[in-house]
Amino acid sequence: MVRSRVSPGLKLQSDASNQSNDKENKLLAYVNDNRHFSLIRALHLADLITLMNGFCGVMSIFSSLRYCLSGQQSAFHLWNAMYFMPFALFFDFLDGKVARWRGKSSLMGQELDSLADLISFGVSPAVFAFCCGFQTFLDTVILSLFVLCGLTRLARFNVSVNSIPKDGSGKSQFFEGTPIPTTLSLVTVCGVCILKGKTHENLPWGEWCGNTPFAFHPLVVLFVLSGIAMTSKKLKVPKI
């Protein structure tokens, strides 16, 4: 008896084709839905949880801005900005589990997840770091590039996720580059600085090249390393 064998490459192509067809069918159903609030109707429970992730990220940004508006006198707002980010991480973990548990995903699910992650783990940590004292021109350029690295990493994930090997539950087996929520480690470093009163002019290792256009804080190099790790293609991080 002859057994047919399907190569892993062909299987991945078949899975990707099936997912593409499913996405096209969902898109057609959404475009042809002329009911009121069709956008809201298209959202699933997992999408609402993803929106909570984005909500926490936006609230973190507002809390950081409140700290700056207070004349940097009330650390209460800065701590609030920091506390919102772990809640965003909780919702980021939860939305995927709920989607797999219910066996349902919406047309916008993956895009919503990436956009929410960009706010909560890209823009929010950068604004938080700025409020902690990374405020020179070069600091802000580096923080901007850090956010762009997160944006690029998420865009790459969206276009390549179908080609990444999956486990039995349909979950990707690894990440290409560090996932963007790992940027919370940088937030933790900033939190330790706040706790020890090492912010603004008291940041560890001070300010280099002061009173020049190239002034920067050495600690901002951590954001450079994080951006490089996120955009690396050779770095494979097992997905838990």
Swiss-Prot record:
GO cellular component, alphabetical, reads: cytoplasm; cytoplasmic vesicle membrane; cytosol; endoplasmic reticulum; endoplasmic reticulum membrane; plasma membrane
Which InterPro entries does UniProt cross-reference here? CDP-alcohol_PTase-I, CDP-diaglyc--ser_O-PTrfase, CDP-diaglyc--ser_O-PTrfase_fun, CDP-OH_P_trans, CDP-OH_PTrfase_TM_dom, CDP_ALCOHOL_P_TRANSF_CS
- Organism equals Schizosaccharomyces pombe (strain 972 / ATCC 24843) (Fission yeast)
**Listed name of the protein:** CDP-diacylglycerol--serine O-phosphatidyltransferase
**Gene Ontology process terms (BP):** CDP-diacylglycerol biosynthetic process; cellular response to calcium ion; cellular response to potassium ion; phosphatidylethanolamine biosynthetic process; phosphatidylserine biosynthetic process; phosphatidylserine metabolic process; plasma membrane organization
Q: Which Pfam families match?
A: CDP-OH_P_transf (PF01066)
> Which EC numbers characterise this protein's activity in its record?
2.7.8.8
Q: Which pathway or pathways does this protein act in?
A: Phospholipid metabolism; phosphatidylethanolamine biosynthesis; phosphatidylethanolamine from CDP-diacylglycerol: step 1/2
The gene from which this protein is expressed is pps1
Report the NCBIfam families cross-referenced here. pssA
Molecular function as annotated in GO: CDP-diacylglycerol-serine O-phosphatidyltransferase activity
Catalysis: reaction(s): a CDP-1,2-diacyl-sn-glycerol + L-serine = a 1,2-diacyl-sn-glycero-3-phospho-L-serine + CMP + H(+)
What is the topology of this protein in the membrane according to its UniProt annotation?
Answer: Multi-pass membrane protein
Cited function? Phosphatidylserine synthase involved in the regulation of processes such as cell morphology, cytokinesis, actin cytoskeleton, and cell wall remodeling and integrity. Also plays a role in the physiological adaptations required for stationary-phase survival.
Q: Which family does it belong to?
A: Belongs to the CDP-alcohol phosphatidyltransferase class-I family.
